[in-house]
């Protein structure tokens, strides 16, 4: 058995994937993992891998000890090779490999470490269960595609720092241990050993601290920061995630949008070689909901939602007419080429609309002979022609309608629009379609909590022309808030902040805080506002989500080095885990939960 050796004076000269035909004739020293070993006609070929790529190493029996050691290595053994670069013989060039024109003839071979047989082959073309990948994440991250994603993450954060540094931003850390505040997701709590019964909270965002930095005169701040939210998980969410956080003083909304557009253009150019056309499109919240049924519109394709309430207000179809009479709406969209949908397919669409609260889904198939629909008999020929014209329907198209409240009709049709867009391949999956959404409502009413809640957060400045409505009609107040959306996914959101104590106190009052409760939770911020707070605003981006879209991945778990599962566990470390009674006692805590087995 070959003995594991040390480096003993060997110094790596090149990365495996860095060698080219121009290096032929050079002596090199390479180190990495055995990706694949092949024994052909007395020669041993080893594909040696490191993070830069692969290169073929040839071991000849004439090399003596080097050949003997190469005979014993297996996949994922760690080795060092010193040898001569030569061009591959004619007919053996591998055009699929960047180093495919050359190979390294081993003169010295050292085994640096052995490896057990991996639970899966370290290669991109292998379909491996995600749970197994996460359990052996240190092996999964060796795969070239995962290495590429790690490098993309590094390149992206470096580009962000370079861009913001050149524009006078300071990178400043804010506390990880802070106090729990309301109006967000559940906090992760950290008990204080020195103050029994009291808790820190891990930050959901640095929102209050970055505003305090503006009070402190920093003027331009950014941070690539960890944030924590104890919420139900989805494919694009994690309990801990990384955020690009920015804040600026003495700015208006246009200043922030312009700078962010330039930042996005720089990052996408530097990392992906993609040029973005500026300025980016903009939609108000109202326009986005009316046309796309979502405040995160995917504008890669049309199929926009159309209001037909005026056309059906007096029609003979009671479902439509009564919805309009109650103050609701009737809206529709045109699905091209879907007139032949079967009853089963139409029922499936109806079920999908019901998930978003729609009480039903009406349909009309446009055919060369006219309209085919169970509800066509309730309309005059003029009304049918008007509906087809309004929705720009053509023979072969399917018209879908929802009659309900404005919100339900918009969200149900918005969901159907996305579903039909996917089914009909109406967009290029490689396209990058950015849009800003602006003028969000400041507040919405929570029937469950029986109070107003902030659509973004309690520190968002109302649009100045809407200030009088704070007293008379709060739900009509628009916020100086903005989201950046890419391909129907929210990349980030921000706002101009409240910088006056009187407006902030009015906002807290609208949200149901008593003066005492506001003082208890946010007294430090209110006090700071008494000492000359500049107008300021900012934005925050989910870095993991942005990388997911840049890399065209389906889940952010691929873009985070050590992610949690959808149940919030780490399969590699088996976290979260129980702790000893002694640890709990030190923190003056006692567990009342039944002992459970961690699925990790």
UniProtKB/Swiss-Prot annotation:
GO terms for cellular component: cytoplasm. It catalyses: tRNA(Asx) + L-aspartate + ATP = L-aspartyl-tRNA(Asx) + AMP + diphosphate. InterPro entries: Aa-tRNA-synt_II, aa-tRNA-synth_II, aa-tRNA-synth_II/BPL/LPL, Asp-tRNA-ligase_1, Asp-tRNA-ligase_1_N, Asp/Asn-tRNA-synth_IIb, AspRS_core, GAD-like_sf. L-aspartate binds at residues 183, 229, 456, 497. Residues 207-210 are annotated as: Aspartate. GO terms for biological process: aspartyl-tRNA aminoacylation. GO terms for molecular function: aspartate-tRNA ligase activity; aspartate-tRNA(Asn) ligase activity; ATP binding; catalytic activity, acting on a protein; nucleic acid binding; transferase activity. Pfam families: GAD (PF02938), tRNA-synt_2 (PF00152), tRNA_anti-codon (PF01336). The record marks 40, 91 as: Important for tRNA non-discrimination. Keywords: Aminoacyl-tRNA synthetase, ATP-binding, Cytoplasm, Ligase, Nucleotide-binding, Protein biosynthesis. It comes from the Bacteria. It is an enzyme of class 6 (ligase). ATP binds at residues 229-231, 238, 490, 542-545. Its EC number is 6.1.1.23. Gene3D superfamilies: Bira Bifunctional Protein, Domain 2 (3.30.930.10), GAD-like domain (3.30.1360.30), Nucleic acid-binding proteins (2.40.50.140). It is found in: Cytoplasm. CDD domains: AspRS_core, EcAspRS_like_N. Aspartyl-tRNA synthetase with relaxed tRNA specificity since it is able to aspartylate not only its cognate tRNA(Asp) but also tRNA(Asn). Reaction proceeds in two steps: L-aspartate is first activated by ATP to form Asp-AMP and then transferred to the acceptor end of tRNA(Asp/Asn). HAMAP family: Asp_tRNA_synth_type1. Homodimer. Belongs to the class-II aminoacyl-tRNA synthetase family. Type 1 subfamily. This is Aspartate--tRNA(Asp/Asn) ligase. The gene is aspS.
């Amino acid at each position: 058995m070959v003995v594991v050796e040390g480096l003993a004076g060997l110094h790596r000269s090149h990365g495996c994937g860095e060698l080219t035909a121009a290096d032929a004739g050079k002596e090199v020293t390479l180190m990495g993992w055995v990706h694949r070993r092949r024994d052909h006609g007395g020669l041993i070929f080893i594909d040696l891998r490191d993070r830069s790529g692969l290169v073929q190493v040839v071991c000849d029996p004439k090399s003596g000890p080097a050949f003997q050691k190469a005979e014993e290595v297996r996949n994922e053994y760690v080795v060092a090779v010193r040898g001569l670069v030569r061009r591959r013989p004619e007919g053996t060039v591998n055009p699929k490999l960047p180093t495919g024109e050359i190979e390294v003839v081993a003169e010295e071979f050292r085994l640096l470490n052995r490896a057990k047989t991996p639970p899966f082959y370290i290669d991109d073309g292998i379909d491996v269960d995600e749970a197994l990948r996460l359990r052996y994440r240190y092996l999964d991250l060796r795969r070239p595609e995962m290495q590429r994603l790690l490098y993309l993450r590094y390149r992206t954060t470096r580009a962000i720092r370079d861009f913001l540094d050149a524009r006078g931003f300071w990178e400043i850390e804010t506390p990880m241990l802070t106090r729990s505040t309301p109006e967000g997701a559940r906090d992760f709590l950290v008990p204080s050993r020195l103050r029994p019964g009291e808790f820190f909270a891990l930050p959901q965002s640095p929102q209050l601290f970055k505003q305090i930095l503006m009070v402190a005169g920093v003027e331009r701040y950014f941070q690539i920061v960890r944030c924590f939210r104890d919420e139900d998980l989805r494919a694009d969410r994690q309990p801990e995630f990384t955020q690009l956080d920015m804040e600026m003083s003495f700015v208006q909304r246009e200043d922030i949008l312009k700078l962010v557009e330039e930042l996005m253009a720089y990052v996408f150019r530097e990392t992906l070689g993609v040029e973005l056309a500026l300025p980016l499109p903009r939609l108000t919240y109202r326009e986005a909901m009316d046309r796309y049924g979502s405040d995160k519109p995917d504008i890669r394709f049309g199929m926009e939602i159309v209001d037909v309430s005026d056309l059906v207000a007096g029609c003979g179809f009671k479902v439509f007419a009564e919805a309009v009479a109650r103050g609701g709406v009737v809206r529709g969209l045109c699905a091209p080429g879907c007139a032949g949908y079967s009853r089963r397919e139409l029922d499936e669409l109806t079920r999908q609309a019901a998930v978003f609260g729609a009480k039903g889904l009406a349909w009309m198939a446009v055919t060369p002979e006219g309209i085919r629909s169970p509800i066509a008999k309730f309309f005059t020929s003029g009304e049918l022609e008007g509906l087809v014209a309004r929705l720009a329907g053509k023979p072969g198209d399917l018209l879908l309608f929802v009659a309900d409240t404005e919100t339900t009709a918009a969200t149900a049709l918005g969901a159907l629009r996305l579903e039909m867009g996917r089914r009909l391949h109406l967009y290029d999956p490689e396209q990058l379609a950015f849009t800003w959404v602006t003028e969000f409502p400041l507040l919405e009413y929570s029937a469950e909590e029986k109070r107003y809640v902030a659509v973004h957060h309690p520190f968002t400045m109302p649009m100045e022309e809407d200030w009088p409505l704070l007293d008379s009609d709060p739900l009509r107040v628009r916020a100086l808030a903005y989201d950046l959306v890419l391909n129907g996914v929210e990349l980030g959101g921000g706002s101009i902040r409240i910088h006056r104590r009187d407006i902030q106190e009015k906002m807290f009052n609208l949200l149901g805080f008593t003066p005492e409760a506001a003082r208890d939770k946010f007294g430090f911020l209110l006090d700071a506002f008494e000492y000359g707070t500049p107008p300021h605003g900012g934005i925050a981006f989910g870095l993991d989500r942005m990388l997911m879209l840049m890399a065209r991945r389906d889940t952010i778990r691929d873009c985070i080095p050590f992610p949690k599962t959808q149940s919030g566990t780490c399969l590699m470390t088996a976290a979260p885990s129980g702790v000893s009674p002694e640890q709990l006692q030190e923190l003056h805590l006692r567990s009342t939960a039944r002992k459970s087995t961690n699925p990790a």
